[in-house]
From Swiss-Prot:
Protein's name according to its UniProt entry: Homoserine kinase
Keywords: Amino-acid biosynthesis, ATP-binding, Kinase, Nucleotide-binding, Threonine biosynthesis, Transferase
Reactions it catalyzes: L-homoserine + ATP = O-phospho-L-homoserine + ADP + H(+)
Molecular function (Gene Ontology), one example: homoserine kinase activity
Biological processes per GO annotation: threonine biosynthetic process
Pfam families noted in UniProt: APH (PF01636)
This protein's record includes keyword Kinase: yes
Family: Belongs to the pseudomonas-type ThrB family.
Pathway noted in the entry: Amino-acid biosynthesis; L-threonine biosynthesis; L-threonine from L-aspartate: step 4/5
Keyword Amino-acid biosynthesis included in the entry's annotation: yes
Assigned EC number: 2.7.1.39
Superkingdom of the organism of origin: Bacteria
Record-linked HAMAP family: Homoser_kinase_2
Amino acid sequence: MAVYTDVAAEELADFLKAYDIGELLSYKGIAEGVENSNYLLHTTSGSFFLTLYEKRVAIDDLPFFLGLMGHLATHGIVCPQPVRTRNGETLGSLAGRPAAIIDFLEGVWPRKPNVAHCAAVGAALAKLHLAGRDFSMRRANALSVWSWRPLFEQAGACADTVQPGLHDFLKAELDHLEARWPQELPGGVIHADLFPDNVLFLGDRLSGLIDFYFACHDFFAYDVAICLNAWCFEPDHAFNVTKARALLGAYHRERALSEAEQAALPLLARGAALRFLLTRLVDFLNVPAGALVKPKDPLEYVRKLRFQQRVGGVRDYGVAILGPVA
């Protein structure tokens, strides 16, 4: 979450008149993430999140995102629901941006994920994949393999200013992945951005999945690969096989990974690393002046990608081939 668009108190109070959530007491911007402008609201009825949609979020995609959150919440997934106006709308306009009010969930995201956190995330991700099967709306992954070359072309000319040799490294990896990307794997609705700051915990109990604004249809195993990269590396950049084993095992117990998915996982993890490397690089090079935002380090994903390039199979993630679930 982040803040790119400032909202005046009077303007916000007027916006909230359309909702039955009480009077505004206070609000503050949240300076995490890179996609939308987010505020925490306190009203006489409780706490809520306000999101103003910016940058890569297309207005036409918002009914999918908001509808998906509502669908998942009614199918056993702990996630925020959009708050409707008195007229039944989930989407409004504020400060020249599309805007929505979202339920507040209790919990904090884990700054130092442990093995129990990783297991909980694996199980929750599998349940999300299963719960999304009968969601009627569809959205293609706008940041899948076909989108990576345009991102590279957008940022590649400046890549070597971030790290010498980065341009050629990115080009070689992109060529490799485009030639080998899988065509047929089980798929459906995926979260596509389930990083630690998008998962809330109360102790070791998972209390919420948030930020569904990259959700789309793609391979389930690609979503798993994103989580391996996001949850299973230590601050010193070492890969933690114990965390990976916990995440994969918990996922597999809820939704069995096929042999084809397991075989593809190392390549998908390379692709997931490249995707976040490229979008972080673009964001790093294009942070708006004065924005209340902390650009994320693209070089973190260079290191993760180099690890994934050396992976020979799921055994390198700390597990044998995962068999049928009893």
